[in-house]
Design a protein with these regions (language model features):
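Short Gly/Pro-enriched turn/cap motifs at secondary-structure boundaries
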Residues: 124-127, 152-155, 171, 196-204
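Internal maturation/activation junctions in enzymes
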Residues: 22, 85-86, 97-134
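Short beta-alpha junctions and helix-cap segments that line functional grooves
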Residues: 105, 131-132, 149-150, 191-195
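Amphipathic, small/basic residue-rich leader segments at the start of a protein or domain
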Residues: 1-84, 100, 104
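Core alpha/beta catalytic barrel or barrel-like domain that forms the active/cofactor pocket
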Residues: 49, 53-54, 76-91, 112-122, ...
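A short core secondary-structure module
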Residues: 143, 147-188
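A glycine-rich, basic-preceded beta-loop-alpha segment at the flavin cofactor/substrate interface
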Residues: 185-187, 191, 196, 206-220
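Flexible, glycine/threonine-enriched loop-and-boundary segments that flank and lead into catalytic domains
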Residues: 25-40, 44-52, 117-141, 145, ...
């Protein structure tokens, strides 16, 4: 079914998707029509969160099957693959998060209710990720607040993001970093979309976090 969707629905719309691109309107990203409709077709086919355990609504399929589906979508439209493929952040949540976080977020990925992003790169930290400076500050109630900028974030408009941030004061290397789950709210602003040479249907965002609430994934 993945091959049928990719070949009969996604691929014929790929050129129009690339011409239309993504737009930033009043602070919100608007996907090209073919992207939104393609994601809905994949959701209806139960291809979202396919590697997740059944207790969270997934299909409990091996990663190799997921990779094959992603390759099919990529061949049809790499822009849609970028967004669909970011369902993979649910695997990170499943591996490292506590049971409460898994129960709260994984069923939403499996149902195709949310899209994701992996917010790593910053203006001064690209391939050298140990230089990440976005700051995470722990609150008295055990939650965290994020402050700083992320750049070149694929699908940074996604509802759920995994954000790499500096959680330990006085550190300058990777040992001071932790991963956080952030659910989109008014404390994160999309400052702009990158003007790319291609794959225009996949939005690449610059993000400004201003005291954004987040949850620690795993341990510090």
């Amino acid at each position: 079914i993945a091959g049928e969707i990719a070949g009969e629905y996604i691929e014929p719309r790929a050129e129009d998707v690339d011409r239309a691109g993504s737009e930033l309107v009043a602070g919100e990203v608007c996907y090209a029509r073919g992207i939104a409709e393609g994601l809905e077709r994949l959701r209806q086919a139960d291809l979202m969160g396919m590697t997740l355990p059944r207790r969270y609504g997934g299909l409990n399929l091996p990663v190799s099957v997921s990779v094959m589906v992603i390759e099919m979508v990529s061949r049809a439209d790499p822009a849609l693959m970028n967004i669909f493929g970011l369902q993979d952040i649910s695997e990170t949540i499943n591996k490292f998060a506590d049971e409460e976080m898994k129960a709260a977020y994984l069923p939403r990925f499996a149902a195709g209710e949310v899209t994701g992003s992996m917010a790593l790169t910053e203006p001064e930290a690209g391939s050298d990720l140990q230089n990440v400076q976005l700051k995470a500050t722990e609150q008295p109630d055990g939650t965290w607040r994020l402050n700083g900028v992320k750049r070149f974030i694929t699908n940074g408009c996604g509802q759920i993001s995994l954000v790499l941030a500096r959680s330990e004061e006085g550190t300058t290397d990777a040992r001071g970093l932790s991963m956080f789950l952030y659910e989109r709210d008014e404390h994160m602003r999309i400052r702009r979309l990158e003007d790319k040479l291609g794959i225009h249907g996949s939005p690449t965002c610059e993000l400004q976090f201003d005291d954004a609430p987040a949850l620690l994934v795993g341990e510090r």
